[in-house]
Every structure is written in structure tokens, then in C-alpha cells.
Amino acid sequence: MPSFDVVSELDKHEVQNAVDNAIKDLDRRYDLKGKGTFEFKDKEQTVLLTAEEEFQLEAMLEILRLALVKRKIDVKCLETKDPYASGKEKKQEAKFREGIDKDLAKKIVATIKDGKLKVQAAIQGEQVRVTGKKRDDLQEAIALLRTKEFDMPLQFNNFRD
């Protein structure tokens, strides 16, 4: 029986490259030169932005988003927290989200069921497995999911006949 998985994954090397590019871009900006830093924590997949003022944090966040787009990483996976003061500096944390949580998985399953396609969707941890009798039905399900807007970037992998 043909099937595929709906997942939300990040290429960690591309994320690292995007953060490195953002650091280089920050050094090139004369208005932010020496006034802000990016600190990337690989294990937690977080970036700590540090600057003197809050508007500089916003500019740094925009630099990071542009670097992600250049590396073809969807910006929807970046979750930012509110800026906070730490001594004379302002700090903000940005986390890269990965995997499909329960609420999003339920939305995906509901979208597929509302589409009245001849496929079944089942939640399996941080992914959704979609099975059907024909390959064409699965391709319709992929097309349906691509038309909908979700709060995480979705990838379709493990396509089996």
C-alpha cells in the first residue's frame, strides 16, 4: 500500500551556515558594527542575539531572517521570544523549531479528512503517515497540504509504493 510521511525537519548544517552568514553580515553593517553579537547554541538549536538597544535587536533579527532565506530555510521554523534587559544590554532568544507537534498533526489530519480524499492519515510521534490505495491519491493529498498554510514548514518524504 503506497504511503508517505509528512515531517518538519531542518538541515542543521544549513542552519549553521545561515547563522555564520548572519554574523558576517552583522560585521559588514557600519550602523551595527561592534554593537551586537549572535551566539549560536548547536545542541539546543537556539541563537542568542545581544545588542545595546532594542531597535538593533530588530535589525539583527532581520539580518538572521534574510540569511535563512538565502540558504533556503523557511523562516516559519524560527520562533522568537520577547527581548529582555541584561545589565546595559538587551538580549533576545530565537529558537529553531523542528518536528510536528500534536496540535499541528491534528490540523494536518483534519485537513486531509476534510479534503474527502481516499487516503488515511495517522499521527506517528513527530510525523504524520499518509497511506492510500493509489499513488495518485497520495499526490492529491500532497497538493492539498501544499495549498494550505500551516505555522511550520512541511516536507514530504519516505514515499513508498
UniProtKB/Swiss-Prot annotation:
Keywords on record: Nucleotide-binding
Gene3D superfamilies the UniProt entry points to: 3.30.70.860, YajQ-like, domain 2
Keyword Nucleotide-binding: yes
Keyword ATP-binding attached: no
GO cellular component: cytosol
CDD domains: YajQ_like
Molecular function in Gene Ontology: nucleotide binding
Taxonomic superkingdom: Bacteria
Recorded coiled-coil stretches: none
Family the entry assigns: Belongs to the YajQ family.
Function description: Nucleotide-binding protein.
Protein's recorded name: Nucleotide-binding protein PSEEN4469
UniProt source species: Pseudomonas entomophila (strain L48)
